[in-house]
């Protein structure tokens, strides 16, 4: 059955209008943002009875996890978002939105001559902008005049990031908090604002319950989904060799590293001869000494490429090697039709899916670096256990209450964090000291940041599952669950040589003398590149195991061994 785009599968009058909360699951590249942009512009919709209903433009607050997506929306001429994140953050008061909504801009659209004037009704911003906006503007006495009554719909794009990014950011907490507060205001009849959460990677949200009167729309199997044709598993050495060969042949490639240091090492050393045709992109630059001319040039070139991608939704034609980090795993479109190969170091499902989906034309090959070191949690596992103690939370909030009293803020009186620098500094200190607590502006208290724990647990479990599958020879099965439409295989030459050897020697599933096993082992050591004692430990990642041929001392096969292919049912 032919896959459809999201707009072809959703009817606003039946799927959106009746509900305060709508959860949309559809694959990467299915047109989620196109659908939301249509809500902001207004459009005509066919009804089941044949009528065509005109849907008026909605005021949309689109919250996304990546600045690149905001820049993309800002720079696109035919979208209905009239501002950018920095303008939104610099609003002095909530009331400034009134004059913003009353202003107009020129909009060019497909299907019209020239341009049309539209009211600047909708805003796109990052998760971080929501955190800063709450700090600057939220007051309990103005709750009924806050964002939920300034917009018709709050859309959370890349909703999985509310959990996924929680491991290293506080901003996702405030997006989650805004969603919950908006739903409470809606249930209390104080707003008609709807919340739409969208993602193409719902796995990390599996434990989330649908709120009362919520509507779940799962179109993962019905809608278009950008997936690579082939997913290949290889170690770092083999990946670098493959990259060299492809670059030498004139191809363009993308490499997603887990660390900035890896990006810089590849740029400076491994692919130095291609520096004039290479580009880098990453967030953190504290590893670079800005006093050095080379580092300043790297940062300038990085900023240029990031701005180019945001404006053009593609890499420059003269760039053949793009080295980046998870900064660009979501929120951007790379529409180059001549990029067919990508390499990724991540071992988590949601990150792999998001990274592969950046190239909208689709990849021919996605390489997963099987021996790449994964990022790990910096704090002790006891941190969350300690943070879960109610007496600690009560103590932090009692101290906060004392700080407010010292500042002359009466109990339960409305106040603004922005107006009290001392309290603002105390909140920042507590959140740094206790990373599993966040100050909640709506609750006016420190609350447990459980999404952070969920995020760290998810990535730890993903890494453990990858390691276990690798040791047990089940990597192909694991990755096949990530990309069900793709062909999954080992790319490495070691695997090919080992498979070819066993096929040619015809030594599988037959009793072997110890001398024959030693001869096989000696050959395998030359392929792997190092000696080994435990056959199963070293050969399971390649899909082979060894066992005794017989435990019966009277059997002619006693003392012999049998080598089998894992998964054949004969182990």
State each model region's role.
Residues 287-324:
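Conserved helicase ATPase core of P-loop NTP-dependent helicases/translocases
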Residues 60-70, 246-270:
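Conserved strand-helix element at the start of the C-terminal RecA-like helicase core
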Residues 345-366:
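Conserved SF2 helicase motif VI
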Residues 202-246:
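Interdomain hinge/linker at the junction between the two RecA-like core domains of SF2 helicases
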Residues 333-345, 366-368:
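A short beta-strand element within the Helicase C-terminal
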Residues 16, 39-40, 382-571:
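The feature captures the C-terminal accessory region of ATP-dependent helicases
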Residues 144-180:
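SF2 helicase catalytic motif II
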Residues 78-135, 305-309:
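Inter-Walker segment of RecA-like/P-loop motor cores
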């Amino acid at each position: 059955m032919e896959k459809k785009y999201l707009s072809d599968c959703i009817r606003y009058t039946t799927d959106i209008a009746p509900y305060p909360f709508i959860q949309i699951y559809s694959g990467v590249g299915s047109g989620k943002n196109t659908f939301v942009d249509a809500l902001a512009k207004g459009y005509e919709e066919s009804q089941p009875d044949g009528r065509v209903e005109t849907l008026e433009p909605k005021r949309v607050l689109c919250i996304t996890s990546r600045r690149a997506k905001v820049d993309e929306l800002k720079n696109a001429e035919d979208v209905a978002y009239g501002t950018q994140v920095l303008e939104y953050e610099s609003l002095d008061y909530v009331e400034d939105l009134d004059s913003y909504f009353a202003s107009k801009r020129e909009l060019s659209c497909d299907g019209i001559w020239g341009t049309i004037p539209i009211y600047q009704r909708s805003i796109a911003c990052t998760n971080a902008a929501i955190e800063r906006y709450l700090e600057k503007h939220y007051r309990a006495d103005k709750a009924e005049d806050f964002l939920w009554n300034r917009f018709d719909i709050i859309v959370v794009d890349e909703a999985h990031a509310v959990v996924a990014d929680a491991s290293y950011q506080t901003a996702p907490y405030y997006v989650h908090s805004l969603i919950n507060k908006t739903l409470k205001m809606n249930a209390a009849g104080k707003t008609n604002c709807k919340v739409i959460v969208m993602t193409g990677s719902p796995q990390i949200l599996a434990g989330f319950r649908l709120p009362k009167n919520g509507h779940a729309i799962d179109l993962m199997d019905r809608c278009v989904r950008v997936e690579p044709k082939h997913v290949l598993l290889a170690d770092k050495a083999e990946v670098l060799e493959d990259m060299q060969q492809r670059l030498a042949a004139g191809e363009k490639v993308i490499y997603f590293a887990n660390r900035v240091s890896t990006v810089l090492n590849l740029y400076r050393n491994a692919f130095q001869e291609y520096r004039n045709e290479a580009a880098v992109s990453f967030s953190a630059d504290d590893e670079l000494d800005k006093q050095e001319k080379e580092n300043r040039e790297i940062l300038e070139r990085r900023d240029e490429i990031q701005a180019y991608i945001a404006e053009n939704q593609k890499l420059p034609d003269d760039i053949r090697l793009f080295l980046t980090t998870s900064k660009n795993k979501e929120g951007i479109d790379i529409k180059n039709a001549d990029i067919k190969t990508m390499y990724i170091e991540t071992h988590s499902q949601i990150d792999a899916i998001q990274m592969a989906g950046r190239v909208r034309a689709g990849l021919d090959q996605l390489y997963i670096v099987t021996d790449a070191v994964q990022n790990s949690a910096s704090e002790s596992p006891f941190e969350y256990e300690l943070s879960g103690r109610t007496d600690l939370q009560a103590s932090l909030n009692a101290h906060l209450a004392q700080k407010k009293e010292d500042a002359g803020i009466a109990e339960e009186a409305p106040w603004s964090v922005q107006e009290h620098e001392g309290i603002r500094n105390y909140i920042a200190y507590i959140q740094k000291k206790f990373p599993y607590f966040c100050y909640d502006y709506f609750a006016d208290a420190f609350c447990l940041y459980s999404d952070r724990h969920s995020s760290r647990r998810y990535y730890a479990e993903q890494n453990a599952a990858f390691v276990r599958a690798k040791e047990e020879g089940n990597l192909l099965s694991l990755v096949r669950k990530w990309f069900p439409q793709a062909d999954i295989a080992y790319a490495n030459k070691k695997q090919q040589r080992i498979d070819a050897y066993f096929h040619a020697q015809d030594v599988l599933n037959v009793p072997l003398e110890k001398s024959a096993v030693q001869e096989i082992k000696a050959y395998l050591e030359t392929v792997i590149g190092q000696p080994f004692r435990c056959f199963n430990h070293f050969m399971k990642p390649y899909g082979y195991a060894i066992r005794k041929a017989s435990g019966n001392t009277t059997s002619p096969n006693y003392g012999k061994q049998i080598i089998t292919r894992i998964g054949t049912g004969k182990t």
